[in-house]
């Protein structure tokens, strides 16, 4: 096959374009084809997905196909989509094909890597277990993140997934001096713009690469943008031996984009109309996110749960790949308990005495025990009132309410809305605080003293102020 073979457009069906080539000049699967859109005068990239016979291929467009027509000349680049990787990409914002979209000059000091790569082999992968401190109490205590693991943020619309992701980026950049890659997959353009400006303001942009394929873009762009960001993260792991964070907001939109193009590619839909290749598509992305002996990629994925139905195939398929799940609760958000992480539904494989240590494990389980007992008692309280409880149960309810409030925490990225300075709490302080509440050391303090504070010492200070007032 000649490297720059040329073909012609046969058919355009929305984001799917069929292209015919000469005998013996067919491109390979995942090759990038280029066509000049006569309406805009710009180059459009098509990615080959299927060979459909008669020397024709079926491709998915990575930008709008408005203006394309039959007979237009298409050129095969002979290689997959390549994106810029390396130090020169830090602090910049790209689209799915690696073009800068921040209005600055061209990217310098970078290499170009293809977005389709094989996962590291079993022998290259690391098996050591290490905890990544996030500085967010509820996460560090109840759903600790493994370094090089995959973490899912589950929640419906408007419960604070994106704010939590932004706070983690800030904490990793400032407290750990780490690099972060952010893939905006099918989310609001306004949020992407806010994220960029907030990161500029917080001075964390220089340690981050942003890659966007937003809601207004065709499904092809949304389907591939996570791979573009992952490729950039792989460079820092494999070449520079760094520990990198990869944020994907939102992994559900990645599945959604795949299902949009799947039917147009002629595949029979499966359960709830999703693509039959759902597990494969997810596996190709997730298997590349791992720790090697050189470095690690820790991935935090916001997962929209359609209609709050956790059994939907999209979130259910994602579950199988995760090491920790952080479930955001609408009930806690309604009570103003932010971050609205559900302490009973959120789990982590790392919450094991052999990994986090006996003290951490016992405190975490003690907290969950008290909260579960409080949850069991809520029906009795609603019907008969607090007076009907035993003295022991009354004490459990009081401690549970303090724990619930102490699990809340002011975040740096929401300072300008809340006017409360953000707090970063080390794991040791988190464990000490909850241990002392469980021991009954603060049974005499008002529960409001524990709301929106960092360490337990701040809660004691707040209690003194409340008593004076």
Swiss-Prot record:
F-type ATPases have 2 components, CF(1) - the catalytic core - and CF(0) - the membrane proton channel. CF(1) has five subunits: alpha(3), beta(3), gamma(1), delta(1), epsilon(1). CF(0) has three main subunits: a(1), b(2) and c(9-12). The alpha and beta chains form an alternating ring which encloses part of the gamma chain. CF(1) is attached to CF(0) by a central stalk formed by the gamma and epsilon chains, while a peripheral stalk is formed by the delta and b chains. It is found in: Cell inner membrane. This is ATP synthase subunit beta. It is a peripheral membrane protein. ATP binds at residues 155-162. Belongs to the ATPase alpha/beta chains family. InterPro entries: AAA+_ATPase, ATP-synt_VA_C, ATP_synth_F1_bsu, ATPase_a/bsu_AS, ATPase_alpha/beta_chains, ATPase_F1/V1/A1_a/bsu_N, ATPase_F1/V1/A1_a/bsu_N_sf, ATPase_F1/V1/A1_a/bsu_nucl-bd. It comes from Thermosipho melanesiensis (strain DSM 12029 / CIP 104789 / BI429). One of its GO terms (molecular function) is ATP binding. Produces ATP from ADP in the presence of a proton gradient across the membrane. The catalytic sites are hosted primarily by the beta subunits.
